[in-house]
């Protein structure tokens, strides 16, 4: 009886993607009119409906809540955020 070498363990497989693939432009077009979270470089979050944005990432939002450390500190009907302050934009609801 010859000892056969055991097969080498396989490296773990990356998890299956849970989001749609596409360009950032496709994502941004898809979230206009939807609820989003905008995180600023300062760490402040704005949650609301994305009205529009431009090529400089300047953002207009409606029904906006400003949160610091997870706590809502202000509510605005409309909010305008200058793009150079934006760290990221994420969907706050399925797209």
Curated annotation (Swiss-Prot):
Region feature (Disordered): 1-27
Keywords: Cytoplasm, mRNA processing, mRNA splicing, Nucleus, Ribonucleoprotein, RNA-binding, rRNA processing, Spliceosome, tRNA processing
Cell compartment(s), UniProt: Cytoplasm; Nucleus
Entries under CDD domains matching the protein: LSm6
Residue span, Sm domain: 23-95
GO molecular function annotation: RNA binding
Pfam family, one: LSM
Disulfide bonds: none
Alphabetical GO biological process terms: maturation of SSU-rRNA; mRNA splicing, via spliceosome; tRNA processing
Bias kind Pro residues: ranges: 1-17
Family matches, as InterPro entries: Lsm6/sSmF (IPR016487), LSM_dom_sf (IPR010920), Sm (IPR047575), Sm_dom_euk/arc (IPR001163)
One of the record's GO cellular component terms: spliceosomal complex
Biological function: Component of LSm protein complexes, which are involved in RNA processing and may function in a chaperone-like manner, facilitating the efficient association of RNA processing factors with their substrates. Component of the cytoplasmic LSM1-LSM7 complex, which is thought to be involved in mRNA degradation by activating the decapping step in the 5'-to-3' mRNA decay pathway. Component of the nuclear LSM2-LSM8 complex, which is involved in splicing of nuclear mRNAs.
Oligomer and partners: Component of the heptameric LSM1-LSM7 complex, which consists of LSM1, LSM2, LSM3, LSM4, LSM5, LSM6 and LSM7. Component of the heptameric LSM2-LSM8 complex, which consists of LSM2, LSM3, LSM4, LSM5, LSM6, LSM7 and LSM8. The LSm subunits form a seven-membered ring structure with a doughnut shape.
Protein family per UniProt: Belongs to the snRNP Sm proteins family. SmF/LSm6 subfamily.
Protein name: U6 snRNA-associated Sm-like protein LSm6
Organism classification: Eukaryota, Fungi, Dikarya, Basidiomycota, Agaricomycotina
């Amino acid at each position: 009886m010859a000892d056969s070498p055991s097969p080498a363990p396989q490296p773990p497989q990356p998890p299956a993607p849970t989001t749609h693939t596409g360009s950032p432009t496709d994502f941004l077009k898809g979230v206009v009119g939807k609820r989003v979270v905008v995180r600023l470089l300062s760490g402040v979050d704005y949650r609301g409906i994305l009205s529009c944005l431009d090529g400089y990432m300047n953002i207009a939002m409606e029904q906006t809540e400003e949160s610091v450390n997870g706590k809502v500190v202000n509510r605005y009907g409309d909010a305008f955020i200058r793009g150079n302050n934006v760290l990221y934009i994420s969907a706050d609801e399925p797209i």
